[in-house]
From Swiss-Prot:
<keyword id="KW-0520">NAD</keyword>
<keyword id="KW-0874">Quinone</keyword>
<dbReference type="InterPro" id="IPR037232">
    <property type="entry name" value="NADH_quin_OxRdtase_su_C/D-like"/>
</dbReference>
<keyword id="KW-1003">Cell membrane</keyword>
<dbReference type="GO" id="GO:0005886">
    <property type="term" value="C:plasma membrane"/>
</dbReference>
<dbReference type="GO" id="GO:0048038">
    <property type="term" value="F:quinone binding"/>
</dbReference>
<keyword id="KW-0830">Ubiquinone</keyword>
<comment type="subunit">
    <text>NDH-1 is composed of 14 different subunits. Subunits NuoB, C, D, E, F, and G constitute the peripheral sector of the complex.</text>
</comment>
<dbReference type="GO" id="GO:0050136">
    <property type="term" value="F:NADH:ubiquinone reductase (non-electrogenic) activity"/>
</dbReference>
<dbReference type="InterPro" id="IPR010218">
    <property type="entry name" value="NADH_DH_suC"/>
</dbReference>
<protein>
    <recommendedName>
        <fullName>NADH-quinone oxidoreductase subunit C</fullName>
        <ecNumber>7.1.1.-</ecNumber>
    </recommendedName>
</protein>
<comment type="similarity">
    <text>Belongs to the complex I 30 kDa subunit family.</text>
</comment>
<keyword id="KW-0997">Cell inner membrane</keyword>
<dbReference type="Pfam" id="PF00329">
    <property type="entry name" value="Complex1_30kDa"/>
</dbReference>
<dbReference type="InterPro" id="IPR020396">
    <property type="entry name" value="NADH_UbQ_OxRdtase_CS"/>
</dbReference>
<keyword id="KW-1278">Translocase</keyword>
<keyword id="KW-0813">Transport</keyword>
Length: 249
């Protein structure tokens, strides 16, 4: 199985010289990092030349604050959450505020992507019994734009609408890019890391207007009861044995 996986990786790197191929061993999970300008072209090649006839899922990812931790687990801490530790990660800010982009010591983890928003697609080849993950990063964090794959796999239509609704990723060429999960008039994109857990507005009954009205959130304060922790113990040491092989051509 490992030989078949590596042989397939060689075929991918030969056919798509600008992509970065990563393999998680021993599971053999393959991920292709594709330049955003080649997103559609690579996906069409995977469908037509490698028989990935089905796209089973597509989603967005927000890497803001990725790799940040609020609590050091390597030693004894004098600041437990019962003592009101002041965290830096997401979930501790109100509307209009932003989480820290660095770690507690002011550095960036080595594997933090430079771009913030990514689109991931999961592909299946029934003919060859293969699965593949394909990822690309939007080049503009302020307005993330990625080409739509509706011409490649028409079934991706609602997946892209979901990613647009929840993350604000714009899929260029999509013919019906509307919200699909949030309510009419919803403000913001709720799966973004800078979207407050308290929300933007709350509802109450207005005695004068005799109806329910939307008002800015004032009754709820941001509160995190579980710390954001990056663990490094025996359990994760075993998982580290499943090393990732990366190859860039």
């Amino acid at each position: 199985m490992a030989e078949q996986t590596l042989s397939f990786v060689d075929c991918l790197t030969s056919r798509f010289p600008t992509v970065r191929v990563s393999v998680a061993q021993p599971r053999g999970e393959i991920t292709l990092d594709v330049p955003v300008v080649e997103w559609c072209a690579v996906c069409k090649g995977l469908r037509d030349e490698f028989d990935f006839e089905q796209l089973s899922d597509l989603c967005g990812v927000d890497y803001l604050g990725y790799g940040n931790a609020e609590w050091d687990t390597t030693g004894v801490s004098a600041q437990g959450f019962s003592r009101g530790v002041a965290g830096k990660a997401v979930g501790r800010f109100a509307w209009g505020e932003f989480p820290s982009a660095g770690t507690n010591d002011g550095t960036q983890p080595w594997d933090v992507p430079q771009e913030r928003f990514a689109v991931l697609a999961h592909l299946i080849s029934y003919r060859h019994n293969r699965r593949l993950r394909v990822r690309c990063f939007a080049s503009n964090d302020a307005l993330p734009i990625v080409a739509s794959l509706t011409d490649v796999w028409p079934g991706v239509n609602w997946f892209e609408r979901e990613a647009f609704d929840l993350f604000g990723i714009v899929f260029e060429g999509h013919l019906d890019l509307r919200r699909i999960l949030t309510d009419y008039g919803f403000i913001g994109h709720p799966f973004r890391k800078d979207f407050p857990l308290t929300g933007n507005v709350e509802v109450r009954y207005d005695e004068e207007k005799k109806r329910v009205v939307y008002v800015p959130v004032t009754s709820v304060e941001p509160r995190v009861s579980v710390p954001r922790v990056i663990r490094d113990d025996a359990r994760f040491g075993a998982a580290a044995g499943e090393s990732t092989h990366s190859e860039t051509v």
